Amino acid sequence: MHTTTTMDSEHVRLLSDEATQCLLNKAGTSSSTQGGWMMIATILIEAWDLYAIAFVLIFIKTDFNPTAAQLGLATAAVQGGALIGALLGGVFADRFGRKKVFIGTMVLFIVLAIAQAFVRDIWDLIILRLLIGIPLGSDISNGYAYIMESMSKGKREQMGSRWQFMFGLGEVFSIIVITLMYVTGMDHSLLWRVALALGAVPAAILLFGRLDLPETPLSLLQRGQFVKAKQVSKQLFNDPLDMLPNQDQKLSKPKLSDFLQVIWADPIKRRATIFAWISNACQGAEFTAWAFYLPVILVLSGVGVSESGSILGTNLVTALIFCLATVSGYVAPLMLPKIGHRGVAMWGFGLAFFGLVLGGFAIQNDWKILIVVGACILMWGHYWDASNGMTIASMVAPTRFRATAAGFGYVFVKAAAFFGAFVFPLLSEALGKAGATFAVSILSLIGFLAAKFILPELYGYVEAEKKA
């Protein structure tokens, strides 16, 4: 049983900060790499849940005959739930630790995913989609904090920037599985229910894989749990942190009111955080306003649709586009040592802007091949511009606020995604598909300008807190 002693609070904080700086500059072990992969794998589950519904919307519409607003809510509700989860999960993880939160969120997601198969009407589905977003948002904010605290400098940035690669894998996996169910002739009313509930399978696998993961030593340090922090530090970083006493100490809990004050006190943190919020908002709306509805856009434009009305060809075209996007997501982290975070963001948003403009003109003139080309350029760019916003928001934050910072950053992704998913169908009705596409391109341009004029180069950055 660990004993807790009371030392001078300022001295305890200095010891904790010294140990934190030591670990942030350490090389990780195979255990820390395993933990990073376990956390970033959450994106596979989110991608399945987010994109599976895009492929079965047409079947949900047939069963429930929803209004345009209800259909928009059914797709956007998960984003609203994730917004709530990102805020709550980040705060809870900073106060109570990473492991308790990431175990709890996976259990909740599994239960809610299965429940989707049994909804009776569109409002049941909307409510469940809202609720299922809460554990998703919570797990992302907590997972990014875990990655930044359990991996070595450079490696943690690359792992964090792999989220688009994992997102692409999840999307391609969902496309393949749903297409196979469609080809087998499964009843469409059953198909969409099974598709949504299947998200529980990878979530259960991930839950069991995480059970043996330790709490991060940095999170333990910030809560005064020095005995456990020394043990876990030895496991993850091969450093027993000899500067710390062998007793736990009492440390004050982090205050949410101090978070922005600390971020704003440092010009590097401030500029990086502002960029991360802008980038997350632009890429979140950019994706859900156009790429999320890509299957619908392709069907309505006649791309891949057979004379008999089969959408199998459309699904295959979409799968190929997302296979390309997955390659882009894999390449983006590899480019960080070469062109840095600014370069990745500028190239990403620039290509996304060009792809959307080209896609808009192609839709306007019914150039089917150019619609596909524009979508490919957009998705390659998007998987670069979306790769590092969450990483930047997390890496510049002090450890005691890191999950909170990740949560705040993810709020901008999900608020923009909710807006994009809900508004794009209405915008398409008002301006047409081409006009709506041109409107979305403005977001990519804003992201490019933010990367050019706001973002300082951060590759290799090691956080050091300045007093407000």
PLM regions: where:
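Transmembrane-helix signature of 12-pass secondary carriers
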Residues: 2-468
